[in-house]
Amino acid sequence: MESCARRCAVSGLTALSMRLTKQLSAAAASKAGAAGNLVFSPLSIYSVLSVVTAGARGRTLTELLGALGAESREKLAANAGEMARALPAPGGGAAQPGGGPRVAHACGVWHERTRTVRPAFRDAAAASFNAAALAVDFLNNPEEARKEINSWVAAATENLIDTILPPGSVSTDTGLVVTSAIYFNGQWWTPFCKEITEKRAFHRLDGGDVEADFMRSGEDQYIAVHDGFKVLKMPYAACVSARTTTTPRYSMYVFLPDERDGLWSLEDRMAAGGEGFLREHTPERRVEVGEFRIPRFKLSFDDSVVGALQRLGVRDVFKPFVADLADVLEAENSGDDPPLFVSDVKHKAVIEVNEEGTEAAAATAVCLTFASAAPSSRRPARVDFVADHPFAFLVLEESSGAVLFAGHVVDPTDE
């Protein structure tokens, strides 16, 4: 029953992850002139948007709830609470005895020290994602405040991400910054043997080939074969006490289209199907493999996600004098406070997948600025799974289905 409740609660996160994958892919391709690799953390972005939603009203609230897949602030808070119970609390990211994954997720609300956070907003942020309200001096020393926030992110991500706010990203007009950081480090349930990793051709979307390092295995694998694509589940090792269970706590899923140029159409299907697509296409049992190869890869992302969110219908919150975030800060005595709006949503993510397992981290920062400032099918007995062409991937927490990391690989040699 508890797992069912968590999966229902996480449906909005899953839908957001699928839709953001499509939007971020398109944005990256437009900027670079060609398709590129992608990694991001849906959970990190969902967390900060959920906290901001706790202070929104009117159409601003409606648009945020629509993107997050919730009917009301109360329902969103309940959903966030279910996810928080499935993930380690801040400070709970120590490695588990017996080799379980190390996972840590934390949120923070950094407000101008001369302003008071509304109690309802502070309590909602704390209840949903254990986000502590921390006072900093944006007004007199924004650079020092920026460094303090970056230090928090670096500590939360084991220094994989040392900076989320670049110089100039906060100013004397900054009223509040909401941050989220996540760290993951897990070894495979069945590690790959480095000695048999070999260089083979990986077929890119542009028709060219690159030589990549492919991990291989003769072990039975969790693979599901569907119309036009296959799905591979690679579980991470659980702690010793959990190894008798049939379902590992965390897994990576690889979605491999049959066609070498089939990544975009597959991602369209994933976006349209949302949480139901993942549930319906999850491998349920191990099968014997014939040829099995998957490349090592190391990816990173560093960009604003404002454009992607706007294309998902979140618009008013980014408009000065239009955004309604009146439930975030207490009004000053004068009663003529400049209103807040979101000037930027910065996101960074990194992931490395190799023979031992996966290490990944992500951070998101939402900058709330006073508007007086300028806005900135049937399974065969034996299956080949050769990921030698572009594929999509997810890292999931199994009991809730929460998507920690998502992305795709179009060239495993391009970091």
From Swiss-Prot:
Residues 357-381 are annotated as: RCL. The reactive center loop (RCL) extends out from the body of the protein and directs binding to the target protease. The protease cleaves the serpin at the reactive site within the RCL, establishing a covalent linkage between the carboxyl group of the serpin reactive site and the serine hydroxyl of the protease. The resulting inactive serpin-protease complex is highly stable. The record marks 371-372 as: Reactive bond. It comes from the Eukaryota. Probable serine protease inhibitor. This is Putative serpin-Z6C. One of its GO terms (cellular component) is extracellular space. SUPFAM superfamilies: Serpins. GO terms for molecular function: serine-type endopeptidase inhibitor activity. It comes from Oryza sativa subsp. japonica. Belongs to the serpin family. Keywords: Protease inhibitor, Serine protease inhibitor. Transmembrane segments: none annotated.
